[in-house]
Amino acid sequence: MKAKQVFFSVLLFGTAGLLLFMYLQAWIEEHHTGKIEKKRDQKGVSVTTGKIQKQITNQNSEVHMPEDLKKKGGDLLNLGSPTRVLRKISHSQRENGAYRSTEAHQGAKIEVFQKPIQMDWPLVTQPLNKSLVQGNKWKKADATQEKRRSFLHEFCKKYGRVNDPKFNLFHIVSRIYVEDKHKILYCEVPKAGCSNWKRILMVLNGLASSAYNISHDTVHYGKHLKTLDSFDLKGVHMRLNTYTKAVFVRDPMERLVSAFRDKFEHPNSYYHPVFGKAIIKKYRPNASAEALNNGSGVKFKEFAYYLLDAHRPVGMDIHWERVSKLCYPCLINYDFVGKFETLGEDANYFLQLIGAPKELTFPNFKDRHSSDERTNAHVVRQYLKDLSTAERQLIYDFYHLDYLMFNYTTPHL
């Protein structure tokens, strides 16, 4: 009898102890997780955006807000707030410059996020040093540049004020390439001459003697260039405030069609299986087994459906992402605004401004598919014919901010 009592007593105390242990463990985990989430919310750098105004004028042109945006009345430059801090992985691992969480990084990089500092947004635009530009050769280019800088500055002053959403500094600068010798920051905009700009940066860095001898794979997969998010916070802050910051843009419709032609009309081991298969599966009724299997043959109309779909089967890509989301012009306040439409003149003028070697000129060759006709307004019209007027309007609305801030003419839809 005593043995039974002892056995039941031990069993009872053991059960009670186990329950107590489980309760304490759950309480500790919940308490600890709460602290972590609270700390996470405190990390990062705060930036700010502003309210929609009704219109903005340049010296010779007026930019009108789309009617639907006037009705919405929200923040024009709504940056959003990512749930995790993102960092770029190797371009050789994924052609579109995918992202991963910085939580996978070790050491000093994590320390950066534990000690946030306040950035003064927007950054102050630096006056261009024109002491190295001689004669009247660049007079027209200089006048054009001043108009663009002034227009973007006025646009951001009216539309780009902020109300304090949190956004991480390292995400904002993740597409900016650094050339320390000539103190240049170049924000990469795919399909706006970025491959040749990377060639120029490699020459300026002393990594190559000529921009004409660097292959496409070396440019994009060689990992020769540093992006601004690879530096610590002090290094990022110093470069943003002292280096010459440049961005080169392109008419949004031309850039979109150029990206489609490059990625979907030619063999591609990444875009066809990753994007093509998902697009065909969702937007092509009765798709063939072959198309579903290899993702080749995406039509522009199907691509447009994907672009405009709030529930895309696969995420956005830098080749057709908006410049406002790639380079954050109203936060970075770029010192030089070049355009693809005047790329040669703009780029060579910029090289003069930064004191590049006299023999270095911007390459004018087509990086890939050289036999294809360049994407221009005529080519764009051929692709837009496949879309209804409403669909064309929706694409314009998608890129409306890029049209507005860089003073591009509204297309005839």
From Swiss-Prot:
Entry-linked InterPro entries: Carb_sulfotrans_8-10, Sulfotransferase
Mapped to this chain, the residue ranges on the Lumenal side of the membrane are 27-413
Q: How does it sit in the membrane?
A: Single-pass type II membrane protein
Location in the cell reads: Golgi apparatus membrane
Q: Which residues form a coiled coil?
A: none
Which tissues express it? Highly expressed in kidney and pituitary gland.
Q: Where are the transmembrane segments?
A: 6-26
Give GO cellular component annotations, separated by semicolons.
Golgi membrane
- This chain belongs to the protein called Carbohydrate sulfotransferase 9
Q: What organism, scientifically named, is this protein from?
A: Mus musculus (Mouse)
The taxonomic lineage of its organism, from the top, reads: Eukaryota, Metazoa, Chordata, Craniata, Vertebrata
Per the record, the gene is Chst9
